[in-house]
Amino acid sequence: MISLIAALAVDRVIGMENAMPWDLPADLAWFKRNTLNKPVVMGRLTWESIGRPLPGRKNIVISSKPGSDDRVQWVKSVDEAIAACGDAEEIMVIGGGRVYEQFLPKAHKLYLTHIDAEVEGDTHFPDYDPDEWESVFSEFHDADAQNSHSYCFEILERR
């Protein structure tokens, strides 16, 4: 099963200059909880923004250029990335924008954090048809001392 996990501000903004323009430790904990012990697939720019392999997960990076870091597995295509995951029960696609776009048609599940923030961004989550997805989980949280904005965790499954 292929799943996409992303945090989206208003207008599906997911990043600005290769970073996330908000401070939400609760979202990072949600991300870790849902990706731990699963393969994670990302693009080269996402890999560079993280700067290190995510522990407890097989890290796979899609890039047209050969990678030099042997702590992760480098592949050149979506199909190679899927093959590199072997018989994993769930593959977690963690970004960025182009990688989400390539995997969305193959995805069975979306783990989305909707952030109540209007921020400028240069990277967006791809547009998806809400009629193709059913919300199976939703949990709202107000902003607090640790989290800069209110947010809602949602899990969608393809109908």
UniProtKB/Swiss-Prot annotation:
One of its GO terms (biological process) is folic acid metabolic process. Its EC number is 1.5.1.3. Pathway: Cofactor biosynthesis; tetrahydrofolate biosynthesis; 5,6,7,8-tetrahydrofolate from 7,8-dihydrofolate: step 1/1. It catalyses: (6S)-5,6,7,8-tetrahydrofolate + NADP(+) = 7,8-dihydrofolate + NADPH + H(+). One of its GO terms (cellular component) is cytosol. It comes from the Bacteria. Coiled coil: none annotated. Keywords: NADP, One-carbon metabolism, Oxidoreductase. Signal peptide: none annotated. The keyword NADP applies. GO terms for molecular function: dihydrofolate reductase activity; NADP binding. Substrate binds at I5, D27, R52, R57, T113. The keyword NADP applies. Residues 1-158 form the DHFR domain. Belongs to the dihydrofolate reductase family. Key enzyme in folate metabolism. Catalyzes an essential reaction for de novo glycine and purine synthesis, and for DNA precursor synthesis. This is Dihydrofolate reductase.
